[in-house]
Amino acid sequence: MSQSRTYQVRTYGCQMNVHDSERLSGLLEAAGYQRAAEGTTPDVVVFNTCAVRENADNRLYGNLGQLRPVKDANPDMQIAVGGCLAQKDRGEIIRRAPWVDVVFGTHNIGSLPALLERARVQREAQVEIVESLERFPSTLPTRRESVYAAWVAISVGCNNTCTFCIVPALRGKEKDRRPGDILAEIRAVVAEGAIEVTLLGQNVNAYGSEFGDRQAFSKLLRACGEIEGLERVRFTSPHPRDFTDDVIAAMAETPNVMPQLHMPLQSGSDRILRAMRRSYRAERFLRIVEKVREAIPDAAITTDVIVGFPGETEEDFAETLRVMEEVRFAHAFTFQYSKRPGTPAASMDNQVPREVVKERYQRLLELQERISEEENAKFVGREVEVLVAEGEGRKDDVHRRMSGRARDNRLVHFAVDEGVTVRPGDMVTVEVTYAAPHHLVADSGIRNLRRTRAGDAWEARNAPERRPTGVLLGMPKVGAPEPQPSVVGGCCDS
């Protein structure tokens, strides 16, 4: 294979998919591919798909249809489809889009380079789906999108049986990574410049169930607190069933674990929670929130909510609104229920009419928008520490601002004084001057700027390549990647 073949990975879905795409990119580059420059047509396009939402199928097949004339004009181009939708649809993808070259599943992403080569040599589509994961794939190369913040997967799969969710069927039973492997990867990314790590799992706080340690997750959080140079630790997404007191204590007592918690509610109605097979009730959820706020008063709590689950009545929906008003989430990812073939909920009676779902959804949005704005308004006049990010603010250039995340993960847009150089990965302290439902603004200037190792790493990664002036041995070069859009919600949310 020519060393000049280029690739592009298109990612849909949750944070786990984003991290899987980093590993797919690492695999391709290890096999000699180069990332396609923006505006060019890649030799290989990889779709890393999601199967959680109803429009996932339409989105994939629509994009595949757009690529058909490109493939017709360039038969050597290859198209690969992986991820949860590939695990679900398998050979159906080739039937509906016969110009696709490779279909691979969630359990064998490491096979992608070999499958591409086999398809190229044999001139026929390759479909390879593995039914289950034998062990956690800890050794796959990774091309990280960020040098200052990193995803680190601690488990894959899920042992829950929520009636609306197809993820366990596609990702399999939970497989836990060994603690030593996790901590070794965290130390490695910190050595490369990262100062923030997010621990990932479909049900992240159930970590340890495979090897029989019910406190493994809290122990892991405390171990992260001992890693020199690691300034921020986050995790997503926990399940209320497994949110135990030892986890709350570890969050409160480990300084680099951030005061932020994303915990899916899904519904405030006990009747609907039972139909969803969620193994908690509203009172249990509220008690967890109470304990978290007792231990971590400044914690920002976010959630997921599904509107219009089969059988949901106006009384059930009112219970959801009541719980949301009581908790006062900093933010909520809200979804209109959609049928997923293969899930028990898809065949339930009493499917809620679409117009009713939309009307309730709008009321839910209006409530959460008000709460988010009221909670954010409490920050006006307060100073916050922000880890400067890349690609977080769509209008930063227009407003001459930069953006980043506060300790509690609130998005902050801040003005940069003329003549001051701030890099992604640096830390700034700013005073909030304005609050909106989804972000804070700090236009009064930077109170403190701390240049960090992460900022140094970002600067080194984005420095122009220098041409050698003598006769030197050829060394591999690392290009500057484009930032990937942040992805929220989705199948990581338990």
Curated annotation (Swiss-Prot):
Span of domain Radical SAM core: 144-374
Compartments reported by the entry: Cytoplasm
Keywords, alphabetical: 4Fe-4S, Cytoplasm, Iron, Iron-sulfur, Metal-binding, S-adenosyl-L-methionine, Transferase, tRNA processing
InterPro entries: Elp3/MiaA/NifB-like_rSAM (IPR006638), Methylthiotransferase (IPR005839), Methylthiotransferase_CS (IPR020612), Methylthiotransferase_N (IPR013848), Methylthiotransferase_N_sf (IPR038135), MiaB_methiolase (IPR006463), rSAM (IPR007197), rSAM_horseshoe (IPR023404)
Principal location class: cytoplasm
Similarity remark: Belongs to the methylthiotransferase family. MiaB subfamily.
Oligomer status and interactors: Monomer.
Protein name: tRNA-2-methylthio-N(6)-dimethylallyladenosine synthase
Organism: Thermobifida fusca (strain YX)
Organism lineage: Bacteria, Bacillati, Actinomycetota, Actinomycetes, Streptosporangiales
